Curated annotation (Swiss-Prot):
It is an enzyme of class 3 (hydrolase). This is 5'-3' exonuclease PLD3. One of its GO terms (biological process) is inflammatory response. The gene is PLD3. It comes from Macaca fascicularis (Crab-eating macaque). It holds the Pfam family PLDc_3. Belongs to the phospholipase D family. Coiled coil: none annotated. The lineage of its organism: Eukaryota, Metazoa, Chordata, Craniata, Vertebrata. It catalyses: Exonucleolytic cleavage in the 5'- to 3'-direction to yield nucleoside 3'-phosphates; a 5'-end 5'-dephospho-ribonucleotidyl-ribonucleotide-RNA + H2O = a ribonucleoside 3'-phosphate + a 5'-end dephospho-ribonucleoside-RNA + H(+); a ribonucleoside 3'-phosphate-2'-3'-cyclophospho-GMP + H2O = a ribonucleoside 3'-phosphate + 2',3'-cyclophospho-GMP + H(+); a 5'-end 5'-dephospho-2'-deoxyribonucleotidyl-2'-deoxyribonucleotide in single-stranded DNA + H2O = a 5'-end dephospho-2'-deoxyribonucleoside in single-stranded DNA + a 2'-deoxyribonucleoside 3'-phosphate + H(+).
Length: 490
């Protein structure tokens, strides 16, 4: 039997009067909440719209991103990058009808030095900015001597100057480097012969990790007045400049005593920017994609595209034309013993012309030091052009003329360019086009994909056509008398 329960009604506490908001404040709060929602919605739509606009711009510019790999999205950079092509035109070499007028290499270098505030990193092959190596008083050496003088002023002003240079395999003047050491610069010699059986053939500057020069010019007074050179200066482009600094840091590491190439490079040297995920930049006010490649493959940390792979990718994706200006072109490992055939680039050019109908123009330098075997390979490539194959390949030799005094200057009067341009891409490198430069020798290249009038690509195309159509370009069957003894291949 259940016990009898006593129920008692609980008393509920009386409610305190609520602090009610006046109706006008409630309405104001609701209005503010509604406005905030609309602002948030507008911001979301703006972000989505901007992304769609940029995607549309790049699709409009490039059609698709097949050139860089499937389904890859470029990593963005918001620097207002400015690119300027710079040239060294040898004294006495005139282009009277040319519309191109680019700044000189010496002007660009002196401008970079004048603007350096915190750091300057230089990767270089050798140093002869004075003409001590010729034991002459050559007036055209003055520009190189001025560059050296300005370099010596930087370290005393607090600029951290670092120079990575290839360790010479034999006697070589070190006067310039000794002067820079005395001024406070740091110098490390990279023994590429020991590391990869090659040399450090790279030629670039990085200033304040914001601006840089990359091109064909050596730290040689002749590269400013007696040798034809081409490079690019990138201003206010810290994203690319910092990435180029990573390549320099690898050289700097290898310049330490007893160093060796790591089996796996530390993550410090890795990059996010490469052929598959190029950097999305605004270049000279228009959209562009860019990345830096490096050689040889053992010097490519995670993410870095090897130079040869980048070069071949540009060749393989050309659909209209391929214009190439290079000092040496040899489908061989010319510094290997015994010599070995190396057709990687040659096959790519033949395939482009034969399979896709791409117009190929190859402008190779000819001077007193040209490798004599090069002629046979150039004739073989040019022979592909006939009425049966409909392959449009042409090869010319560029000869820099020299008067009696200029002819006495050693290792001068040559077209030292190392670039390629297609209807889609620009490739500016530091290597000659033969096998060892990509398998053993250290080099760097800048690749830019940009269309439109006034683009870097269109400017480089104009320079190539100026040279190709100039009186300094000669067919392979030209008479040797037309160039005197300045060309070994005729």
């Amino acid at each position: 039997m259940k016990p009898k329960l006593m129920y008692q009604e609980l008393k509920v506490p009386a409610e305190e009067p609520a602090n009610e908001l006046p109706m006008n404040e409630i309405e104001a709060w609701k209005a503010a909440e509604k406005k905030a929602r609309w602002v948030l919605l507008v911001l979301i739509l703006a972000v989505v719209g901007f992304g769609a606009l940029m995607t549309q711009l790049f699709l409009w510019e490039y059609g698709d991103l097949h050139l860089f790999g499937p389904n890859q999205r470029p990593a963005p950079c918001y620097d207002p990058c400015e690119a300027v092509l710079v040239e060294s035109i040898p004294e006495g070499l005139d282009f009277p009808n040319a519309s191109t007028g680019n700044p000189s290499t010496s002007q660009a270098w002196l401008g970079l030095l004048a603007g350096a505030h915190s750091s300057l990193d230089i990767a270089s092959f050798y140093w002869t900015l004075t003409n001590n190596d010729t034991h002459t008083q050559e007036p055209s050496a003055q520009q190189g001597e001025e560059v050296l003088r300005q370099l010596q002023t930087l370290a005393p002003k607090g600029v951290n100057v670092r120079i990575a240079v290839s360790k010479p395999n034999g006697p070589q003047p070190q006067t310039d480097l000794q002067a820079l050491l005395q001024s406070g610069a740091q110098v490390r010699m990279v023994d590429m012969q020991k590391l990869t059986h090659g040399v450090l053939h790279t030629k670039f500057w990085v200033v304040d990790q914001t601006h840089f020069y990359l091109g064909s010019a050596n730290m040689d007074w002749r590269s400013l007045t007696q040798v034809k050179e081409l490079g690019v200066v990138m201003y206010n482009c810290s994203c690319l400049a910092r990435d180029l600094t990573k390549i320099f840091e690898a050289y700097w590491f290898l310049g330490q005593a007893g160093s060796s190439i790591p089996s796996t490079w530390p993550r410090f040297y890795d990059t996010r920017y490469n052929q598959e995920t190029p950097m999305e930049i605004c270049l000279n006010g228009t959209p562009a994609l860019a990345y830096l490649a490096s050689a040889p493959p053992p010097l490519c940390p995670s993410g870095r595209t090897p130079d040869l792979k980048a070069l071949l990718n540009v060749v393989d994706n050309a659909r209209s034309f391929i214009y190439i200006a290079v000092m040496n072109y040899l489908p061989t490992l010319e510094f290997s013993h015994p010599h070995r055939f190396w057709p990687a680039i040659d096959d790519g050019l033949r395939r482009a012309a034969y399979e896709r109908g791409v117009k190929v123009r190859l402008l190779v330098s000819c001077w007193r030091h040209s490798e004599s075997s090069m002629r046979a390979f150039l004739l073989s490539l040019a022979a592909l052009r006939d009425n049966h194959t409909h392959s449009d390949i042409q090869v010319k030799l560029f000869v820099v003329p020299a008067d009696e005094a200029q002819a006495r200057i050693p290792y001068a009067r040559v077209n030292h360019n190392k670039y390629m341009v297609t209807e889609r891409a620009t490739y500016i490198g530091t290597s000659n086009w033969s096998g060892n430069y990509f398998t053993e020798t250290a080099g760097t290249s800048l690749l830019v994909m940009q269309n439109g009038r006034g683009s870097l690509r269109s400017q480089l195309e104009a320079i190539f056509l100026r040279d190709w159509d100039s009186p300094y370009s000669h067919d392979l069957d030209a008479s040797a008398d037309s160039v005197g003894n300045a060309c070994r291949l005729l």
